[in-house]
Amino acid sequence: MLGKIVTKIFGSRNERAIRRMRKVVAQINQLEPEFEKLTDDELKAKTDEFRERLKKGEKEEDILPEAFATVREASKRVFGMRHFDVQLIGGMVLNDRCIAEMRTGEGKTLTATLPAYLNALSGKGVHVVTVNDYLAQRDAENNRPLFEFLGLSVGINLPNMAPPAKREAYNADITYGTNNEFGFDYLRDNMAFSPEERVQRKLHYALVDEVDSILIDEARTPLIISGPAEDSSELYIKMNKVIPHLVPQEKEDSDTFQGEGDYSVDEKTRQVNITERGLVKIEGLLAEAGMMKEGESLYSPANIMLMHHVTAALRAHALFTKDVDYIVKDGEVIIVDEHTGRTMQGRRWSDGLHQAVEAKEGVKIQNENQTLASITFQNYFRLYEKLAGMTGTADTEAFEFNSIYRLETIVIPTNRPMVRKDLPDLVYMNEKGKFAAIIEDIRERTKNGQPVLVGTISIEKSEEISQALTKANIHHNVLNAKFHAMEADIIANAGLPSAVTIATNMAGRGTDIVLGGSWQTEVAKLENPTEEQIEEIKAQWQKRHDAVLASGGLHIIGTERHESRRIDNQLRGRAGRQGDEGSSRFYLSMEDSLMRIFASDKVSGMMRKLGMNETEAIEHPWVTKAIANAQRKVENRNFDIRKQLLEYDDVANDQRRAIYTQRNELLDVADVSETIDSIRQDVFTSMIDNYIPPQSLEEMWDIEGLTACLQNDFDLNLPIKEWLDKEPELHEETLRERILEKSIEVYKAKEEIVSAEMMRNFEKGVMLQTLDSLWKEHLAAMDYLRQGIHLRGYAQKDPKQEYKRESFAMFANMLESLKYEVISTLSKVQVRLPEEVEELERRRREEAERLAKQQQLSHEVTKESQMSAVDGQVASGKKVGRNEPCPCGSGKKYKHCHGKLG
């Protein structure tokens, strides 16, 4: 109560922030007449003036009014567009490390030019982050004339660009690109083998467009750079034949299962659980297929890999649906983003799930991947010195932005009052009744010339609605992940009189639907249009625009509520832009996913008791409240998942930072010999400690073990026993010194053969390769630890604390292994004189020719003998990976040594 009184007197936090900024807006407006008098050259010179003032110690906040006035005046001259006062407020919010919530059509792209210009003046670079390549290119090209007029350079960071082009884009004052590409470049830079391979500068200021989509919807998706692991496609195909024999349990209500079944599906958590009956059945089926011995348990350690494949195949069949979660295109399974309805080319599910879906769909199964480097968007964007974002819908997630990213959300007032009518939800008993009502509503509205946008939550639903409209003879356009290329065209025409457009969630996001259609699109279709033609097109557009406004503006129909209120608000926000007329309504049924899984069973019970049929709808505040509560439940659960993911990833993040810092320091120095000497001393000290405990009696020494270890791990053949027999005065300390001296002596002898410079390069290469190899193994080990750590809860232990403790111990072990392996590899390397290398190369060529002849002969004999000849070439033991060290001991990768011969 007291809080409400205080808010009434002093205004909310948001209102107070806006009031404070309006004072600065007044200063900018006062500067306008003065800046209008400046010539183009004088206006351009302001950039150098601001840079000088910043160098002399002035802060960005000190020059903000003048900088914003400069951008506004330049925009008027270059684009003929003047920033509104609310856009100036938006620019200030973005400069203050906050999130600006700006409604659709309020000009977010133009607003972004203000803080981008101001923060680029320091010369440290500004990254403008968008959700897809199309928007990155569009915004960069649209704003380039303005920034170049003011003397700033603009770069675009796109996938598949060559490193020099990427470096040039990053060295620009303002760089546009997607969240994925910025994140992947960061990971790639931390896998580089020379400073020249790196493309990014220090991360200074990120301005994130559609910030809710990137920092919240995609927060659970880590960016992973991976390499191929062992091929196990045969196992996925076999498992795919087993799963269809299993029967799911029936669901009694939203939380309980009943009756017999082999597995239960929890749609809330998207998990499948095998029942006792199912376990027995699976074990029997696997034994029949010869994949497991009769009477063995699926949970035994020997079958842990089979259990992994069973779970992946079961999830693929029970939880992932074609045209909802993924599409199959050109023999490939492509993921569909659940939040935007866009396809995510190149993205793959991990833990064998993608391979299981490929087996289910009968397409070619790609190899499983092994993680080489990974980071979540949460941790990547927190690396920037300064972070800000803008979106049309952030207020519902304000708490999450604040608690995870320390970003306050400020709602920016609209330039004109919003007059869109948001009509109450209508709830039907089933989908059939809902679809009939939607079609009737569309028919009525298009009769009056009103354009309609129908929002669906999946490709499958958009196609169902499309079929129903085709049956009803209603002309319409479909915009979903399958028709990606036509997106801009369809959106440009969605505001035409009587146009009907069906769109999955937020396909076409970032493009405004203009009432009456887009006259610019019509002009673009003409070759060299005359002024008269342009004026004629504008006049026709004005007539259409006025007709659409008179019919009620754009009408939005939601066919289902999304799990998040924010996504529903985004759909509504497509109508009523810039004070235009518009309306929206959601049509729901008790068969919708959200209603079925989360909404109270009481609602459907109440509808049945009222004796409602499928054509009747219920419209009541209770129902709206039940739906809002259901959405709140899901939002809270998703927030908890993201928060928990971050808490676990923070542990890995500390280790990642330590490794990447060490790696970058290593890249930047030319000579690592001092580090190698220091590591050698540590390694030999701890290794000798294992065989000669410090301050121990000679009888406790394991001389045989020490000699063998030096020979096997460091290629040192030292007569330690002889030394001790001949020199009784040789005590522990002097023995340690002698072993170390001998190892240095042998190493220096190698260095004299090949030159110090070559040895320094080799040392650096070995350190980097060993670090990368062990980090890759460490990431896999951390992943396994993470998957099973929740079970510690049953032992009354805190899983998070256990994860921190164990991962730290693993990290410490990894660093010790790094030292040991580096010294071992450097000690074992065989150094050859040039003439010896030529002789070895001659022998290798002869061996390759002999094998080639042998293969040629094997093709000429029968199939059976051919098989035996091939079998004769297969070495026994573990298959050597292409990127592993060659077993011959050369120190080269297998693919560059004996792997070439096959």
From Swiss-Prot:
It catalyses: ATP + H2O + cellular proteinSide 1 = ADP + phosphate + cellular proteinSide 2. Its cofactor is Zn(2+). CDD domains: DEXDc_SecA, SF2_C_secA. Residues 892-902 have a biased composition (Basic residues). It is a peripheral membrane protein. It is found in: Cell inner membrane; Cytoplasm. Zn(2+) binds at C886, C888, C897, H898. This is Protein translocase subunit SecA. Part of the Sec protein translocase complex. Interacts with the SecYEG preprotein conducting channel. Has a central role in coupling the hydrolysis of ATP to the transfer of proteins into and across the cell membrane, serving both as a receptor for the preprotein-SecB complex and as an ATP-driven molecular motor driving the stepwise translocation of polypeptide chains across the membrane. GO terms for biological process: intracellular protein transmembrane transport; protein import; protein targeting; protein transport by the Sec complex. It is an enzyme of class 7 (translocase). One of its GO terms (cellular component) is plasma membrane. NCBIfam families: PRK12904.1, secA. GO terms for molecular function: ATP binding; metal ion binding; protein-exporting ATPase activity. Belongs to the SecA family. Induction: Repressed under conditions of excess protein secretion capacity and derepressed when protein secretion becomes limiting. This is regulated by SecM. Residues 853-868 have a biased composition (Polar residues). May bind 1 zinc ion per subunit. ATP binds at Q87, G105, E106, G107, K108, T109, D512. Pfam families: P-loop_SecA, SEC-C, SecA_DEAD, SecA_PP_bind, SecA_SW.
